[in-house]
Amino acid sequence: MAPNIRKSHPLLKMVNNSLIDLPAPSNISAWWNFGSLLGICLLTQILTGLLLAMHYTADTTLAFSSVAHTCRNVQYGWLIRNLHANGASFFFICIYLHIGRGFYYGSYLYKETWNTGVILLLTLMATAFVGYVLPWGQMSFWGATVITNLFSAIPYIGQTLVEWAWGGFSVDNPTLTRFFALHFLLPFMIAGLTLIHLTFLHESGSNNSLGIVSNCDKIPFHPYFTLKDILGFMLMLLPLTTLALFSPNLLGDPENFTPANPLVTPPHIKPEWYFLFAYAILRSIPNKLGGVLALAASVLVLFLAPFLHKAKQRAMTFRPLSQLLFWILVANLFILTWVGSQPVEHPFIIIGQLASITYFTILLILFPITGALENKMLNY
């Protein structure tokens, strides 16, 4: 019998082992679709971004008008830009749901996979931040000024670091040029990290919704999960195109339709919606360095998840107390997101501070205690 080329060819063999003959648990639900959805998001963003970069000029005098030119005069330029801007929102929706799934089902116990995932999140956040500066509108400019300025809170080297990042004494042409270079580079870094993420995942195999070893009951990835993933692609690309075609500016800030002006500060400086939870935590501490540390901790706390797991069961499927805590955490994140979009005044200040305390308390204290308590209740 002739050897099957997909199993013998050096390159096709790798694709085969990752996407065709990969043994997958038979009971993984739609929550396991978000990994492939993130892959589609990345491909869409790289493709639309490449097309946009062909018409973009990274210069403070031309950036804003080059984006306007793309939308007005380039064939389907408006659509490409709308897909790219809203694609970022869908990227973050998918990654937050993907992390939430990992948290709920104890997937963080695959430490290497989880850690590379958190690094991917940080890289994605950096990419989105530098990308938001490129249109050079008011919110782009002031967002860049405020966030880069946070580095000045670092003792001793802070101010030098900020001026080095800016390429001068304020956010100006050198800043825009380097941010464009970084925004072009980072997605390819994300693609590389994704391959590492998948390599680690395929070492252990997927977790499942029962949180138990499923080696005795595996099915081939193709055709079962390829079809399931394609359905997922359709269900994500439909709302993305709907948003891009019908309400492209729904998630944007009206302030960004005004060209950047260093002499006029917008009344409310705020980032895109997907950073608001972290922004609320930053603002909740009335000290610059403290705020910066809390901001960093709000994401870096994910690295601690494997060490804070005290339950004998892996998933939360049969742990109602942890489930309750998990959904309180989700609600808390929604509150933080809402507070981050509001002005700094009463009652939003105190709500933000309480929500920030709750966020860290649940993750660092209540989850381990509840896990240990459930062990006791189940006589483990």
Swiss-Prot record:
Heme 1 (or BL or b562) is low-potential and absorbs at about 562 nm, and heme 2 (or BH or b566) is high-potential and absorbs at about 566 nm. Belongs to the cytochrome b family. Heme b b562 binds at residues 84, 183. The cytochrome bc1 complex contains 11 subunits: 3 respiratory subunits (MT-CYB, CYC1 and UQCRFS1), 2 core proteins (UQCRC1 and UQCRC2) and 6 low-molecular weight proteins (UQCRH/QCR6, UQCRB/QCR7, UQCRQ/QCR8, UQCR10/QCR9, UQCR11/QCR10 and a cleavage product of UQCRFS1). This cytochrome bc1 complex then forms a dimer. It is a multi-pass membrane protein. The keyword Hydrolase does not apply. The chain crosses the membrane at residues 34-54, 78-99, 114-134, 179-199, 227-247, 289-309, 321-341, 348-368. A ubiquinone binds at residue 202. Component of the ubiquinol-cytochrome c reductase complex (complex III or cytochrome b-c1 complex) that is part of the mitochondrial respiratory chain. The b-c1 complex mediates electron transfer from ubiquinol to cytochrome c. Contributes to the generation of a proton gradient across the mitochondrial membrane that is then used for ATP synthesis. It holds the Pfam family Cytochrom_B_C. Its cofactor is heme b. Signal peptide: none annotated. This is Cytochrome b. The lineage of its organism: Eukaryota, Metazoa, Chordata, Craniata, Vertebrata. GO terms for biological process: mitochondrial electron transport, ubiquinol to cytochrome c. The keyword Zinc-finger does not apply. Heme b b566 binds at residues 98, 197. It is found in: Mitochondrion inner membrane. Keywords: Electron transport, Heme, Iron, Membrane, Metal-binding, Mitochondrion, Mitochondrion inner membrane, Respiratory chain, Transmembrane, Transmembrane helix, Transport, Ubiquinone. Binds 2 heme b groups non-covalently. GO terms for molecular function: metal ion binding; ubiquinol-cytochrome-c reductase activity.
